[in-house]
Amino acid sequence: MQILDHMALLSPLDWIAAGAILVSWHILGWMIEHPFAKRPSVTVLMSERRRDWMKVFVTRDPRIFDSQILASLRQGTAFFASTCLLAVGGVLALAGNTEPLRGVEAEVTAMTTPVLIFQLKLGLVALLLTNAFLKFVWANRVFGYCAVLMAAVPNDPADPTAFPRAAQAAELNIRAAINFNR
């Protein structure tokens, strides 16, 4: 069978459900990143706090506290990335052996669904989880870039490059957080 023949096995409701998932995912992400002015999202509020953090960072001595916060952020991204990887593995294992799904299907409906339909539906879940994994890995990497830039901030607050570099570190930190939240 060709791929189009396999796709023909999906019902119109399957296509509507897949479309609704993808459209909802896109709209929700857009609403989080572009909130209404009266009700800013946590992402917008935290972006300002991250900028404030880097302004204070320039004058803080010692900077161990800041390195611990950044290490904690990186550990969070690494945890979620590894969790996504485990979930992708679980979904792919389930796609390889759909018997557990057939058992649930037998209890819920009188219909029998071809194995390929289960695999196609699980494929969408695997793609979404893979996207999440890549976003978490990228966020972890950008937090690493932020750490390098923070290390490049001079210890002397009077240095003319101190605050501009801290501002750059803040923007990298914000970018990493945005990727983490996507």
Annotate each PLM feature:
Residues 1-5, 85-111:
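Juxtamembrane "helix exit" motif at the C-terminal ends of alpha-helical transmembrane segments
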Residues 8-19, 109-125:
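Hydrophobic alpha-helical transmembrane segments
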Residues 14-42, 80-89, 122-144:
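Hydrophobic alpha-helical membrane-embedded segments
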Residues 32-70:
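Membrane-interface amphipathic/juxtamembrane segments adjacent to transmembrane helices
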Residues 35-36, 40, 94, 98-99, ...:
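Membrane-interfacial segments
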Residues 53-67, 148-178:
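Solvent-exposed, non-transmembrane helices and loops of integral membrane proteins
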Residues 66-93, 118, 122-126, 135, ...:
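Transmembrane alpha-helical segments and their cytosolic interface motifs
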Residues 114-117, 123-167:
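Cytosol-/stroma-facing membrane-proximal "stalk/adaptor" domains immediately downstream
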